[in-house]
């Protein structure tokens, strides 16, 4: 596909998931409606991953594209209709007989993803070692967790220029080079195996029983003498605790096969979340999810959530922004040279702050301007003025004085409090 075609293809898919209910805001959200350049809902300001959007095909396309032109092409299949690579996600279905009073019924459990191993018992064991709330059983909290992490850890706009907003041809080329580089240097998929299946351990992983410490240990290929593995103890690279004999471990090829992880320890070193579908990025001796690997390589715009490939961008409040995206979170007006207030780490212009976020003075019942001094006690605020911060009984100014708060009122003395009770 030539560059012009790629530029024409760019779009954010605003119809996708339209009207889907928000799982976080419930009835407060009118339904998902994608903001025209932010990756959030225009109605409730939550991300698409917080909404009940059916994205299984889209997510499989996204992961399929990630694995395209890598050594992991065995995990994808190209559709005959459009040639788009699709992720061949391994689904595991377990059937358990359940004894009833009259007959035996079958209880079926479907895992929306499972490690692609031939030994289903090993895959089942792997699942049981994950926290219950993170096991991707269809229709469960764990399936919702996986869906959310796919969106969070592997943003489509971190690998596909057509999912980004108004990139220049130069930025498209730079992004394509960046994606090609991380595919060849950092991207990987974990392997689930029993520790002894990977060959001889390194000397620092060898465990010598207390009574035999003077006996030299012989290292050799474990495949040829599997019985020798009983004298070996393996340790998790993350938690440093030992692996129990017979338990599955995760290996990461880019890290080297002398390192292994408990299934629940195979997490991103930045966000500490399980690496979704064991997809990892390896850098400087650490595991990263896709999002946080990219964050370690490129600045990310706090407005549109995309990586910044332009040489010119702005920094404010310890965050990075495209020049055109340093805008009010409420009204989208550009904030360059304007007064703004940070609300939940989002910049808001002064008019929107006064209208939507400002606290109300208990004295005059007007919004308190962000630049004006105020007095705050618990959940109550007052203008720090002789007209507002007054005794609720005798109207004595209380600035710099002791006071008695009672349910939004303040008193200068016990006597005044008694008079109002």
Curated annotation (Swiss-Prot):
Pfam families (UniProt xref): LIM, PET
SUPFAM superfamilies: Glucocorticoid receptor-like (DNA-binding domain)
A GO term, aspect molecular function: zinc ion binding
BP-aspect Gene Ontology terms: negative regulation of cell population proliferation
Domain PET: 92-199
LIM zinc-binding domain segment(s): 234-297, 299-359, 362-421
Region feature (Disordered): 133-164
Classification via InterPro entries: LIM1_Testin (IPR034958), LIM2_Testin (IPR034959), LIM3_Testin (IPR034960), PET_domain (IPR010442), PET_testin (IPR033724), Pk/Esn/Tes (IPR047120), Znf_LIM (IPR001781)
Keywords per UniProt: Cell junction, Cytoplasm, LIM domain, Metal-binding, Repeat, Zinc
Biased amino acid composition, Basic and acidic residues: 155-164
Subcellular localization, as worded in the UniProt entry: Cytoplasm; Cell junction, Focal adhesion
GO annotation, cellular component aspect: cytoplasm; focal adhesion
Domain remarks in the Swiss-Prot or TrEMBL record: The N-terminal and the C-terminal halves of the protein can associate with each other, thereby hindering interactions with ZYX.
Subunit record text: Interacts via LIM domain 1 with ZYX. Interacts (via LIM domain 3) with ENAH and VASP. Interacts with ALKBH4, talin, actin, alpha-actinin, GRIP1 and PXN. Interacts (via LIM domain 2) with ACTL7A (via N-terminus). Heterodimer with ACTL7A; the heterodimer interacts with ENAH to form a heterotrimer.
Family: Belongs to the prickle / espinas / testin family.
Function: Scaffold protein that may play a role in cell adhesion, cell spreading and in the reorganization of the actin cytoskeleton. Plays a role in the regulation of cell proliferation. May act as a tumor suppressor.
Name of protein: Testin
